[in-house]
Amino acid sequence: MLRQILSSAVAKSTRGLSFTVNRLASNLDKSEYTTPGEIIDYDDPTHLPVPEYPLRPDEPLETRKQRLLYQSRKRGMLENDLLLSTFVAKYLRDFNADQTAQYDKLINGVSNDWDIFYWATETKATPAEYDNEIMQMLKQHVKNEERVQRIRQPDL
């Protein structure tokens, strides 16, 4: 008898709960919260001053390459850490002074690392200012046609 009373009480309470949840879910406009295939990327606010990266015209080439190696590994964003550190490990030692300057401008001239990621993965168009030989090499590197596993940064 007690078992029948409890089972009927549970059935009545869950029916009401189920009705309430279904009613709430049906009122929810799901398109407001999902963006299939769309990137959520807001413009940087104009009221936040972004300091310009200081130019280092007298920096020796080897010192510049060492600095760029470090900066490529410490982006603060895992995606770029992996992409840029593997790119630098493969190409930086063979860069001439002009290519090194282009790479320096790319990783230090852009204020938002997501921009570098979107350009390299060709999710967004690269601005003409950064669309150079180094960016083309980076885009080719990101395609990973050799199917190299890039789950960690290369050893120093």
Curated annotation (Swiss-Prot):
It comes from the Eukaryota. Residues 1-12 form a transit peptide. The keyword Mitochondrion applies. Gene3D superfamilies: Flavinator of succinate dehydrogenase. It is found in: Mitochondrion matrix. One of its GO terms (biological process) is protein-FAD linkage. Interacts with the flavoprotein subunit within the SDH catalytic dimer. The keyword Transit peptide applies. Keywords: Chaperone, Mitochondrion, Transit peptide. This is Succinate dehydrogenase assembly factor 2-B, mitochondrial. Coiled coil: none annotated. One of its GO terms (cellular component) is mitochondrion. Plays an essential role in the assembly of succinate dehydrogenase (SDH), an enzyme complex (also referred to as respiratory complex II) that is a component of both the tricarboxylic acid (TCA) cycle and the mitochondrial electron transport chain, and which couples the oxidation of succinate to fumarate with the reduction of ubiquinone (coenzyme Q) to ubiquinol. Required for flavinylation (covalent attachment of FAD) of the flavoprotein subunit of the SDH catalytic dimer. Belongs to the SDHAF2 family.
